[in-house]
């Protein structure tokens, strides 16, 4: 018999590693759906950020893992309802970090191949 997310979360909060693994396994399809939706909606395949859906799924797993200790079943909320924003936010954090790293790599090269760092207006103007 499959245990509920709320019961598995309560066990995981008490230190049961097997319950945490089961909780992640029970929600793999949801995490995969969120990752695929985000990958398509942000057009990450064409972005040049070197991210794929597996990266987003891994970030989603971490988001779910971080939501476990903060979940309070006494508030009457289902675990996945509580964890969904944490899962999506973890994926968005990964995309933001990848974009920031991509921006830092952007340079302008002249005809001699000399590279100059990108300069923003706020760095030049008073």
Where are these regions (language model features)?
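Alpha-helical promoter-recognition and RNA polymerase-docking modules of transcription initiation factors
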Residues: 1-103
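Charged, low-cysteine interdomain linkers and short loop/connector segments
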Residues: 95-96, 100-126
């Amino acid at each position: 018999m499959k245990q509920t997310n709320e019961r598995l979360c309560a066990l995981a909060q008490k230190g049961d590693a097997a319950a945490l693994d089961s909780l992640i396994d029970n929600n793999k399809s949801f995490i995969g759906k969120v990752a695929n939706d985000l990958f398509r909606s942000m057009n990450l395949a064409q972005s040049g950020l070197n991210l794929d859906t597996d990266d987003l799924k891994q970030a989603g797993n971490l988001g779910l893992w971080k939501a476990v200790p903060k979940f309070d079943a006494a508030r009457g909320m289902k675990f996945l309802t509580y964890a969904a924003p944490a899962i999506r936010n973890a994926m968005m954090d990964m995309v933001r970090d990848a974009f920031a790293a991509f921006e830092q790599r952007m340079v302008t090269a002249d005809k001699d191949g000399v590279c100059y760092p990108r300069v923003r207006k706020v760095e030049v103007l008073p």
